[in-house]
């Protein structure tokens, strides 16, 4: 049986700067949670089609690692817990 494709990769941006990379089954609801937690950003950008949870986790890790390589090892501003 095929695994459900119900997870999206997204990034939060403050103008042109990426401040968070994450995954969610409901990116709009997750954006509201980020706002309620005090995160500052101007928009959310969904970066993928619906993926399986495992594929989404792999893509999230790859995107955070790519960001770190391009920014001297630093993760996006709000990606404190998930750094690779």
Q: Where are the predicted features?
A:
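Internal alpha-helical transmembrane segments
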Residues: 75-76
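GIY-YIG nuclease catalytic motif and its immediate N-terminal context
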Residues: 1-69, 81-84
């Amino acid at each position: 049986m095929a695994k459900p494709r119900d997870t999206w990769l997204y990034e939060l941006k403050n103008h042109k700067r990426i401040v968070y990379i994450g995954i969610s089954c409901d990116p709009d609801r997750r954006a509201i949670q980020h706002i309620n937690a005090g995160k500052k950003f101007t928009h959310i950008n969904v970066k993928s089609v619906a993926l399986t949870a495992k594929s989404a986790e792999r893509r999230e890790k790859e995107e955070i690692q790519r960001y770190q390589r391009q920014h001297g090892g630093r993760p996006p501003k709000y990606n404190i817990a998930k750094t690779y």
